[in-house]
């Protein structure tokens, strides 16, 4: 059995749908929201790599590295906000984010 472009695109679509479901079902926990956003970026990266491979173009794979860099910065900032929220409120509830002043 060979893996075709459709297999990779369906995998990307399933990962993307799973992350959207995770965002809509759990809007309270900041860690779950960050993980769902990272899963969404992983789905997009999977599609970029699949198209890049099957079209024989390296631009998609290069663009994935830029997306990974932005995702790492996003995760670092999100976890820093999470640590600040937990220190101040002893909770990681998203509803308490509006109480942070700085």
UniProtKB/Swiss-Prot annotation:
InterPro entries in UniProt: NADH_UbQ_OxRdtase_chain4L/K, NUOK/Mnh_C1-like
Complex and partners: NDH-1 is composed of 14 different subunits. Subunits NuoA, H, J, K, L, M, N constitute the membrane sector of the complex.
Purpose: NDH-1 shuttles electrons from NADH, via FMN and iron-sulfur (Fe-S) centers, to quinones in the respiratory chain. The immediate electron acceptor for the enzyme in this species is believed to be ubiquinone. Couples the redox reaction to proton translocation (for every two electrons transferred, four hydrogen ions are translocated across the cytoplasmic membrane), and thus conserves the redox energy in a proton gradient.
Organism of this sequence: Albidiferax ferrireducens (strain ATCC BAA-621 / DSM 15236 / T118)
Pfam families: Oxidored_q2
A GO molecular-function descriptor: NADH:ubiquinone reductase (non-electrogenic) activity
Keyword terms of this UniProt record: Cell inner membrane, Cell membrane, Membrane, NAD, Quinone, Translocase, Transmembrane, Transmembrane helix, Transport, Ubiquinone
Membrane-crossing residue ranges in chain numbering: 5-25, 31-51, 62-82
UniProt keyword annotation of Cell wall biogenesis/degradation present: no
Family per record: Belongs to the complex I subunit 4L family.
Protein name: NADH-quinone oxidoreductase subunit K
This enzyme's EC code(s): 7.1.1.-
